[in-house]
Amino acid sequence: PFYAVTVNGVSVDGELLKIPRLVWNIERGGGTILDSGTSLTVLASPAYRVVVAALSKKLAALPRVIMDPFEYCYNWTSPSTGEDLAVPVPDLAFHLAGAARLQPPAKSYVIDAAPGVKCIGVQEGEWPGVSVIGNILQQEHLWEFDTKNRRLRFMRSRCTQ
């Protein structure tokens, strides 16, 4: 199932990104849904470009790797030691209606794609078009969908432990 949510913005490392507001407006050809049946998050093209630019700028110290179907992948392994590099993943947050903030763990948007390779797990969607917050980004949270009162509640949870 999927549920419409109101996104007011997205931030990377606490900096609110300059994404046109109409991207989040269903009446202007945009909008956002939370979909448990879609794995990766898909952002409408204007939002995608801004979000991946901000994330990739923070990951610029890592060598880029080409790996379909992802556009932004990085070699996270030191060529000299074979160990994972200690490069911090920037924080990503979706600012929702009612001052709610969805701040997923890094593993939900910078995902392991192959040994030593991590990719930005967000895909580019059409514009105009609806953005989709997929189930990988929803992980490590408990969700409550109150359809009768049209409310969504969520909280961080170590569901896997």
Model-inferred region functions:
Residues 2-5, 9, 24-34, 41-46, ...:
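Aspartic protease catalytic domain
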Residues 15-24:
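Active-site palm subdomain of RNA-directed nucleic acid polymerases
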